[in-house]
Each structure stands twice: as structure tokens, then as C-alpha cells.
Regions:
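Flexible, surface-exposed loop regions and adjacent strand-edge segments
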Residues: 49-53, 86-93, 143, 173-181, ...
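Outer-membrane beta-barrel and related beta-rich outer-membrane complex signature
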Residues: 45, 79-85, 168-178, 241-245
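Hydrophobic, well-ordered secondary-structure elements that form the walls
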Residues: 19, 144, 160, 213, ...
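Gram-negative/organellar outer-membrane beta-barrel architecture
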Residues: 1-124, 137-138, 148-158, 182-206, ...
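Extracytoplasmic gating/loop element in the C-terminal half of outer-membrane beta-barrel translocons
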Residues: 153-232, 240
Length: 274
């Protein structure tokens, strides 16, 4: 299976080419190769810009019933640039880097179905281990999502997200390795606009976590099958500045409540929140 993809957002441009064999030599193990180029422009909000080009390969297989293990390796060349708004510490991280990481992914999937899930849970843990790295950054990510039908045609979802990034050698992690909460994890806030600041720049943290609760309202638009309306409550935080602990004075939990709309189209779901 060959897939080429170009993704453009407000801050990123990503192009990738992926080759996947879902049943390599009838072993029930998938093998994949990925080549990608990624540009992330955070000059306005965070004072830096990064260009990353590299490749990765790995395998994924079912270890036990509903338990999947993924093993892989990523290598990439990265160039980090800063602008005049960046602090002296940020500017010191500008330069060129070559990194290689080993990846481990553990996935326990008890959902009743992958598309429009209504029952079960999904538990996922991943770790990136540095092999060749100037900063020796170790990244851990854990996501747990629980689905339940509280009453007829209702789907209630609870999700927990936690991520950390720290250097094994007590160095400062790179600007591009610092953690930001995705907009989908803390709706109502600008993506990346939460957590520690260095001057006027949001610089991300060494740690991030969030809790999301969402429940559908089937009484609204009951005759439209491809649109779901729901209420949500999000709460999250980003904290930790390894290169200057005095900057971590924005260590506060943010929260939001609102209405979400999911439109299930042929090209995938489209979401909006108010």
C-alpha cells in the first residue's frame, strides 16, 4: 500500500510518502516505511521555526487479543531558526541537528468499532528513546479514551491525555521537542496558546495533560444521521521549563465548556466547537 500526503495548517506544512505491507510474508505483522518533510513556523507565537526531513520504518503486530505492539525507528535532520523576539536561551538552540530515536507503542483496543465508536475503551502508551541525539530527549505519551452509551442513541466519551519530554542527560530539550496542548484537547483556546511564556512567546512545556468529557445530544437533529451535536468539558495544563524554571509562573489549569458539532463526510469527520 502506497500513500502520499500533503497536509497544510496555519503553522505547519507536511509532506510524506508512506509504504505499508499489512501482512508481511503472511506473518500477520505489518511493515511500514515513511519518508517525510515537515516545516513548523512558530515565529509569531513562539519565536522559532523548524524544518525537519527524515525517514522511519517499523512493524506492528497483535501480541494478544486486542493488544498491539509497535516497534520502529525514526531518523531526521532538523534546522531550527529563531527571530529577534526569541530570548537569549532560545537563540542558543538555533542550529542544525541529526537525531535517531527508537519507538515503542503499546495499544489495547476494546472498542466495539473504530468508526463512530459507542462502547469500550482505547488505551495507548508510546515512548521515544534517543539513540543519536545532542539533547538525549525521552518522550512519553499516554492516552486513554472510554466510550459509553448512557441512554438510547447517546454516546458519552471520557478521555485522558498525558505527555512528558525530558533529557536523560539533564540537558535542555530542543524548542521543537517542547510540548503544546493540541486544540482538540483544550477547545476554546488558541492551539499552543497555553502554558509557560518567555517574554511574549508561548514556549510549551516539559509536561502536558488534559481531561475531556463529551456527551452527545441525540434529541438535536435526530433525523440527520451524519451529524452529531454534543456538549463538552475540557480541562488541561502545560508546565515545566527546563532551561529557566523562573518562567514557569503560568502553571494553571485551564478549562472550557461548550457545544461541539461532528459532521461525518466521505473524506472523514469535520469538527467545530462553540
Amino acid at each position: 500500500k502506497l500513500v502520499s500526503e500533503l497536509t497544510v495548517s496555519e503553522e505547519t506544512i507536511k509532506g510524506q510518502f508512506n509504504v505499508n505491507n499489512p501482512n508481511f510474508r503472511n506473518s500477520d505483522k505489518s511493515i511500514n516505511l515513511n519518508v517525510q518533510s515537515l516545516e513548523t513556523d512558530k515565529l509569531t507565537d513562539s519565536g522559532y521555526k523548524t524544518n525537519k526531513t527524515g525517514f522511519g520504518f517499523g512493524t506492528n503486530f497483535e501480541y494478544q487479543d486486542d493488544v498491539f505492539i509497535g516497534l520502529g525507528q525514526d531518523s531526521y535532520y532538523e534546522k531550527i531558526e529563531t527571530n529577534s523576539s526569541a530570548s537569549t536561551r532560545q537563540k542558543s538552540q538555533a542550529g542544525n541537528y541529526w537525531d535517531t530515536f527508537l519507538n515503542l507503542n503499546l495499544n489495547y483496543d476494546k472498542r466495539n468499532q473504530k468508526y463512530r465508536t459507542s462502547d469500550g475503551f482505547l488505551s495507548n502508551y508510546s515512548i521515544n528513546l534517543p539513540v543519536i541525539s545532542e539533547n538525549n530527549s525521552l518522550t512519553n505519551t499516554y492516552v486513554y479514551t472510554l466510550y459509553n452509551e448512557l441512554y438510547e442513541d447517546n454516546v458519552t466519551k471520557f478521555s485522558f491525555f498525558a505527555k512528558s519530554a525530558n533529557s536523560l542527560t539533564n540537558d535542555n530539550i530542543k524548542l521543537s521537542e517542547r510540548i503544546y496542548l493540541p486544540g482538540s484537547r483544550l477547545r476554546g483556546f488558541v492551539s499552543g496558546g497555553v502554558g509557560p511564556k518567555d517574554g511574549n512567546d508561548f514556549i510549551g512545556g516539559n509536561y502536558a495533560s488534559s481531561i475531556n468529557i463529551q456527551t452527545s445530544i441525540p434529541q438535536l437533529l435526530p433525523n440527520i444521521q451524519n451529524i452529531d451535536v454534543s456538549m463538552f468539558l475540557d480541562a488541561g495544563n502545560v508546565w515545566g521549563v527546563d532551561y529557566d524554571s523562573s518562567l514557569d509562573d503560568t502553571n494553571k489549569i485551564r478549562s472550557s465548556i461548550g457545544i461541539g458539532i461532528d459532521w461525518f463526510t466521505l473524506i472523514g469527520p469535520l469538527s467545530a466547537s462553540f
